[in-house]
Amino acid sequence: GSHIGILYTDYFPRESKRGGAWMNSYRKQSMKNDEMITPVIFNVGNFSKPTGDKPSLLSYDEALTLFHEFGHALHGLLSNVKYESLSGTAVSRDFVELPSQIMENWASHPEVMKQYAKHYETGESIPDELIEKIKASENFNQGFATVEFLAAAFLDMDWHTLNSVDNIKVNEFETTSLNK
């Protein structure tokens, strides 16, 4: 293999750290005088810490987040562009989530789960019955999520069909739109 970049990780919470998970870069990939400048990428999370003599045991949601952010890291590490301004996640908003969504989707595939979701003491893979329950739970509260997407779409349509935005009061406009 060859050097493609450096990945730093900071996965556990601490008092001075903001919540959530994200990827960023100290240096983006680019070309300078026909020489590849390799990226320096970092992934940050706030995953469950190890306790006592037990390792960090991630929840399913934390595993999805880890895969998601690693997708962003791969996007940054595997860039091969001339200009830093086009490197990694410095792409159009509609594309920036593609690598991370692919990784997140893979994380929920049963055959992939069997590779990483193992009992920390026995090494036994996650049982098929538990995978089925996890998959079934993904449909829970789907009606609410659909209503949220529709509300955002209707609000967008109202904004984009305005003839003028002069003197518009944003909060009033959005309240009226969402109360239709």
Give each language-model segment a name.
Residues 1-180:
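Cation-handling catalytic/transport regions enriched in His/Asp/Glu
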